[in-house]
Amino acid sequence: MRIGAYEDLDNLNPVLSDELFATNVFQLLFSGLIDYDDRGDPVPDLAIAVPTQQNGGISRDGRTITYRLRHGVVWSDGAPLTAADVKFTWEQILNPRNNVAYRYPYDQARSIDTPDPYTVVVHLAEPSAPFVANFMRNGSLGSIVPKHLLDGYPDLNHVAYNTKPVGSGPFVLVRWDPGALLDLKPNPRYFRGAPKLAEIQYRIIPNQNTLLTAVQSHSIDIFLHATESQYAVLKSVPGYRVTAVPNLDYEHVTFNCAKAPFDDVRVRRAFAYAIDWKRVNDDAYLGVDVPGMTDQSPAMWSYDPHVLPYPHDTAKALTLLREAGWSRGPDGVLVKDGRRFTADISSVVGNGTRLKAEELIQQNLRDIGVELGVRNYPANLLFASYGADGVLARGRFDIALYGWSFNPDPDDTDTLGPGSVPPYGVNYTFYKDADIARWQEAGKTHYSRSERVGYYWKIQERTHDAVPFHTINWQAPINAVNTDLRNFRPVPAVADFWNAYEWEI
């Protein structure tokens, strides 16, 4: 079975990568304590049950979480997988020497006990609903790695394991040619039994038009994340079905709030008014996806329906820029203190939809006197960690346009919390707000949705006014799938390969 994707992977160690396409590959190679099914609900993976207060997995005070592991699970090399591996993975995520994308919510655990090989007891400083939703969930930061192979290294940044991983998932890696191919075969030791597919070839094809041609020639079986402009063409290709399942992935524009002139809220708000968000969504994304403003999906219980995208208002944008000290120069370009208003927008190379969006934004900003250049990067450079000199993590950008995958819990501490600014996390806005930090803290200490929702509404209202980012849309990723492939069930949360052990062709 052949999968085609347009983004390369930075490495194959789930401790060190949370890139969107990598999460799918991790679901093939690894296991977590929990996973998420095609309804977006948490389901057990290596854990026997998802902890709740009702089943006794969460203590009455909310500070102790107990996971009970399946018996008889082994790594693909035959070594037993035990509670010690879970604790070791947690320790590596918190190891400051490791180039980890973010450490939240793992840093909320005060300690972890392993009273026996099949029990993991997590002690939290405070109750944390997002911890339970995210701790060791497969396909993201938290896919469990083997202690017996990695223990003893001062850090995991450059170990051979990162290109030749041993996992506990349904498949094992046979070969990886970076930028070209991952070849995977069934794991005969997989705890659910060997998967039904004889082989998976994960092909890296950096251009989405080339991927479309591959579908038309029937040389791939799954085309991951096609562009909206390819939707109608893919629907006409015989032998393929096209899925577009709304999920928690969102396209957004992020402003570097630590870098002038975007450290001025008036400039950010001016850009929000200047950009015609509806046109960007309709013309670049063909209106397939749901327009948005904040980082809470309309499909989530935490969504505030009163917070709407900024209207297109060039006059309002110019007024705000004048208040911020910018005025038109003789050639029409804005000038302040002798400095012309020039900036770059950055995204991933090879994505036609995002390039179209960048060009539309470029046109809108030209109308208000901003010279906006387009400076795109390969995914493995744009999204690399702080320690690996990533463009976003190091703040070497003005404006960035990219997709992000929100987790099933509304807590956004990792992407918006003041304590998650790189190198401590993935708050690539570099925006810091003490009120938001307080609301995030209050929101995560309750397990009841009714007690939490008000805090997330406050955060959405604040980010609307401060504009550290502006969501373009919530996506329904378009996948073209060979009709001979059975049991491919995309997920509205996390990643799409959660049940790869059930696939048949």
Predicted segments with their positions:
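Alpha-helical secondary-structure segments
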Residues: 2, 82-89, 117-123, 169-170, ...
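Gly/Pro-rich hinge or "lid" segments in bacterial periplasmic/extracellular proteins
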Residues: 37-41, 138-195, 199, 209, ...
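Ligand-site clamp/hinge motif
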Residues: 159-162, 187-233, 357-362, 371-373, ...
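Detector for C-terminal structural segments
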Residues: 177, 181, 186, 251, ...
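Surface-exposed binding/hinge segments that line
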Residues: 103-152, 175
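N-terminal lobe/hinge region of extracytoplasmic solute-binding protein
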Residues: 4-58, 91, 166-168
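Aromatic- and charge-enriched surface segment that lines or borders ligand/interaction sites
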Residues: 50-99, 121, 214, 261
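Short helices/loops that flank or line small-molecule/ion binding pockets
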Residues: 78-80, 85, 209-219, 236-237, ...
